[in-house]
A protein has these predicted regions:
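Conserved alpha-helical substructure of the radical SAM core
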Residues: 1-102, 110, 114
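Alpha-helical scaffolding segments of alpha/beta enzyme cores, especially the outer helices
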Residues: 37-40, 68, 72-79, 102-106, ...
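Non-cysteine beta-strand/loop elements that form the S-adenosyl-L-methionine
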Residues: 104, 108, 112-124, 189-197
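"Short basic amphipathic alpha-helical interaction patches in structured regions
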Residues: 22-24, 34, 107, 131-134, ...
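Buried hydrophobic side chains on well-structured beta-strands
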Residues: 56-58, 92, 118, 161, ...
Length: 236
């Protein structure tokens, strides 16, 4: 009861068109009127004295398409929490494609975003097959380079690398642990999470269900393999 959790969808669109995605996207950014309404709602909640913690989750679509909203609202949230002596924390679920080194620094230092969930669907081949850019382009190398820049920083954060697992990329996901994954293996800020791709809904793409679903839950087996290989695992 002392925790107020707020999930904010900064933008209705996404720069990816993943083959298994369930969302229907609209190219709509958050209006200043909606931002003002969120601030007013938050003021009323925080000044009630009921809360000691505020947790904000930035979501989408792709939330970094609405980076201006994060940039405008975060300082207001932080100031309100300081005023009412409330602990503030913030998280973002992002595909990481737009998260440049500069934006990451701002999110971490200025806006107190210290928790990140980023998806890599195996190695370069399998990821680029499942997680396609809106324009049909490839995404793995840029995301991986951005993740490496994150790892090379000195900031405090937790980054969950999520793998959506299908029959098509199962082997590639396993091989990530002995190839590209070694960059993050000894860094406790990075944690791995596995999820079977399910029948999540058609979304708005004809290419939906171009992946073959697994007939078993692979998350436990893959998590066990990651732990025995020396990786840190995210709690469910």
């Amino acid at each position: 009861a002392e925790l107020l959790e707020l999930t904010i969808l900064t933008h209705g669109d996404c720069n990816f068109r993943c083959k298994y995605c369930y969302e229907k996207f609209e190219n709509i950014a958050m209006s200043t009127e909606t931002e003002d309404a969120i601030v007013q709602f938050l003021k009323e909640k925080l000044q009630s004295g009921k809360y000691k913690y505020l947790s904000v989750g930035w979501f989408g679509g792709e939330p970094l398409l609405g980076y201006k909203t994060i940039k405008r609202l975060s300082p207001v949230f932080i100031d309100l929490c300081e005023k009412y002596q409330i602990h503030y924390q913030s998280a973002i679920t992002t595909n990481r494609y737009l998260l440049t080194k500069n934006k990451f620094r701002y999110l971490n230092e200025k806006f107190k975003v210290t928790s990140y969930q980023i998806t890599l669907d195996g190695d370069e081949e399998s990821h680029n097959n499942q997680r396609v850019l809106q324009n049909g382009g490839l995404s793995y190398n840029r995301i991986f380079d951005n993740l490496k820049a994150m790892q090379e920083s000195k900031f405090d954060f937790i980054c969950v690398i999520r793998f959506n697992v299908s029959k098509d990329n199962y082997q590639n996901v396993k091989e990530f642990l002995t190839h590209d994954g070694i960059y993050f293996k000894d860094d406790s800020r990075f944690k791995i999470s596995y999820h079977n791709i399910g029948n999540w809904g058609k979304g708005d793409r004809d290419i939906n269900y171009c992946v073959t679903l697994l007939d078993k839950d692979a998350s436990f087996e893959l998590s066990k393999l990651a732990v025995t290989s020396g990786y840190h695992i995210s709690s469910p």
